[in-house]
A protein has these predicted regions:
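Membrane-interface segments of envelope glycosyltransferases acting on lipid-linked substrates or membrane lipids
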Residues: 6-10, 36, 128, 144, ...
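Short, structured coil segments at secondary-structure junctions
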Residues: 54-55, 105
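Short beta->alpha connector loops at strand-helix junctions that form conserved
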Residues: 59-64, 112
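Glycine-rich phosphate-binding loop signature in dinucleotide/nucleotide-binding domains
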Residues: 79-85
Length: 220
């Protein structure tokens, strides 16, 4: 990496807790990345105030003002490119992006999903993991591709499911892990340790055959 931090944009729909974790990590001395813009798809997103409190420029691309997905995606893409971001992190962004948008940002678009992908793509992941009797659950940071929740996984945070766990209890512990692994992945990419090469993930110059794993005693 060069001495200049990699500019990162974060896209949100809600309260922005993962965005705040990413942003706070970027404020640490020697961070290889800097959050240069937070973009929301609704004016009521709580994360806008969180970002502003950290001194991060914010903008809103209100999805309801656009007649279709294509026009919204085009406006969002223009906002992100105008920010100068080299990496875009979707953090609680509740829209499915078009294949055209994904292709435009190929190799520099991340998402976090609350399951150990490829398990439980889509919604209600915590309840589904409990119903299946799984021993472990967690979250995955992955590159975004046209396949929903199907891009190459970079890192997973994993925890053990406890006897008597509820979806809400598991969700709280998964969020703790999310706030660890998402900034970590941004750091790995910005420092050049993780790379996207023609649809594959490389770690320290070698193909990543399995996701990097983070297990936290506090979340176990």
């Amino acid at each position: 990496m060069t001495g200049v931090p990699m500019p990162v944009a974060v896209v949100i729909s809600g309260r922005g807790s993962n965005m705040e974790a990413i942003a706070r990590a970027s404020l640490a001395a020697g961070s290889p990345y800097k959050v240069v813009r937070v973009v929301a798809d609704r004016e009521t997103a709580g994360g806008i105030a969180r970002a502003a409190a950290l001194g991060i420029p914010t903008s809103v691309v209100p999805v309801r003002q656009f007649p279709d997905r294509a026009s919204f995606d085009a406006a969002l893409a223009a906002e992100l490119e105008g920010s100068g971001a080299k990496l875009v992190a979707l953090a609680g962004f509740m829209r499915i992006l078009s294949p055209e948008f994904v292709h435009r940002f190929e190799g520099r678009l991340l998402n976090i999903h609350p399951s150990l992908l490829p398990l439980y793509k889509g919604l209600d992941t915590h309840a589904r993991a409990l119903a299946a009797g799984d021993s472990h659950h967690g979250a995955s940071v992955h590159y975004v591709t046209a396949e929903l929740d199907g891009g190459p996984v970079i890192m997973q945070g994993r925890l053990r499911i406890r006897s008597g766990d509820t979806p809400d209890a598991v969700s709280a512990r998964v969020h703790t892990l999310e706030h660890i692994i998402y900034p970590h992945v941004c750091t790995l990419i910005a420092s050049g340790r993780v790379e996207w090469r023609t649809g594959s993930v490389f770690f320290d110059g070698a193909p990543l055959s399995a996701p990097l794993i983070e297990e936290s005693d506090a979340a176990a």
